[in-house]
From Swiss-Prot:
PANTHER family: ACTIVATOR OF BASAL TRANSCRIPTION 1 (PTHR12311:SF7). One of its GO terms (cellular component) is nucleolus. Involved in the small subunit (SSU) processome assembly and function, and in the 18S rRNA synthesis. Required for the early cleavages at sites A0, A1 and A2. It comes from the Eukaryota. Residues 66-76 have a biased composition (Basic residues). It is found in: Nucleus, Nucleolus. Residues 1-127, 272-321 are annotated as: Disordered. Residues 82-92 have a biased composition (Acidic residues). It comes from Aspergillus oryzae (strain ATCC 42149 / RIB 40). InterPro entries: ABT1/Esf2, ABT1/ESF2_RRM, Nucleotide-bd_a/b_plait_sf, RBD_domain_sf. GO terms for biological process: endonucleolytic cleavage in 5'-ETS of tricistronic rRNA transcript (SSU-rRNA, 5.8S rRNA, LSU-rRNA); endonucleolytic cleavage in ITS1 to separate SSU-rRNA from 5.8S rRNA and LSU-rRNA from tricistronic rRNA transcript (SSU-rRNA, 5.8S rRNA, LSU-rRNA); endonucleolytic cleavage to generate mature 5'-end of SSU-rRNA from (SSU-rRNA, 5.8S rRNA, LSU-rRNA); small-subunit processome assembly. The gene is esf2. This is Pre-rRNA-processing protein esf2. Residues 21-34, 105-119, 296-321 have a biased composition (Basic and acidic residues).
């Protein structure tokens, strides 16, 4: 092993000021790193060589002892290095076969079935039933369960339009349940929708005798050629119209409020001006500028200039009309 010629622990450590004066040099830093790694590599190689020498000496002693004891023993087995090399070869062969298997699996999975372009797309075979009136306070989930209990299913979609209370109606305080005016129910098949509309139309809801909806009557109609997309378009159109009307009404109300507030502000300004004028007059009267006599408020008298009314032809006399003709002729000669 190599011996250190100098003790690093007893040497003086470089000061920070010196490093700061030198600055940071990337090349110098890389060279120092390479030098340190080379030093570590040489130290590890020396340690390994020492250990190998010791192992070789010990193995020679063991061989001598085994030979002195007797030569009638079995031949020495294969060294561990040979066994390890054989195992490595087997692992390489198995890994090669596995790699081949993986490629085969990938090729099999990559082969996909071509799409059937000849088949037409599936038709929408759903049917829609319209309910013109609904029992009061009937919820969509309850309506769906009622129809499915009578084996009219499966039901895919339900839409109920809520009732809009007029502005003049009294405000409800206690009852918060919603009421619906009409609704649409979509069935998975047209056949079920037609059968439901034919059997339940103009019949009582039924169910439990003391139930809430027992005596109400179904009002159903199958909508031929009507799909759920058409309904959504209609509902969206109605909603947009309702929102547009509401926006127009809101704009009109805002405009009226703005005009009213402007009138109130102008009225306040005029009242303030009148009050100030009265206060000025009072101060003048108190100071004696008016000679101690109270002057009455001067009433404003407005004068208007009225345009002269021209006489029509039916009001003009014959002499005046002839004179006008003469004057016109004379003036025409002069000018």
């Amino acid at each position: 092993m190599t011996t250190r010629k100098r003790n690093e622990f007893l040497d003086l450590a470089p000061s920070d000021d010196e490093d700061n004066d030198r600055g940071y040099d990337s090349e110098a830093a890389e060279e120092s790193k390479a030098r340190i790694s080379k030093r570590r590599r040489t130290q590890t190689q020396d340690d390994e060589s020492d250990q190998s020498d010791n192992d070789s000496v010990a193995s020679d002693e063991d061989l001598k002892l085994s030979k002195s004891k007797g030569k009638a023993k079995k031949p020495q087995q294969r060294s561990e290095e040979d066994v390890i090399s054989d195992n490595d070869d087997e692992q390489q062969e198995t890994s090669g076969t596995q790699y081949l298997d993986v490629t085969e699996q990938e090729t099999k999975s990559s082969k996909r079935k071509p799409l059937d372009k000849g088949k037409p797309p599936k038709k929408n075979k759903t049917g829609v039933v319209y309910l013109s009136s609904l029992p009061p306070y009937l919820k969509p989930f309850a309506l769906k369960s009622m129809l499915e209990a009578r084996s009219f299913g499966p039901i895919t979609k339900v839409f109920l339009s809520p009732s809009v209370r007029p502005a003049s109606a009294p405000r409800r305080r206690s009852n918060k349940r919603k009421t619906y005016t009409d609704g649409w129910v979509e069935f998975a098949s047209k056949k079920t929708a037609k059968l439901c509309a034919e059997t339940l139309n103009a019949s009582i809801v039924g169910g439990r005798k003391g139930g809430w909806y027992h005596d109400d009557v179904w009002n159903m109609k199958y909508l031929k050629g009507f799909k759920w997309g058409d309904l959504m378009e209609q509902v969206q159109r109605e909603r947009q119209e309702r929102e547009a009307k509401q926006r127009i009404e809101d704009a009109r109300a805002r405009k009226e409020d703005k005009v009213f507030l402007q009138g109130v502000e102008t009225g306040k300004v005029l009242d303030g001006m009148q009050r100030k004028n009265e206060e000025k007059k009072k101060r003048k009267m108190e100071s004696g500028d008016a000679g101690g006599q109270q002057t009455e408020e001067l009433k404003v008298r407005r004068t208007f200039k009225q345009n002269e009314v021209k006489k029509g032809r039916h009001t003009i006399k014959d002499g005046e009309a002839a004179l006008e003709d003469d004057t016109k002729r004379v003036l025409g000669k002069i000018f």
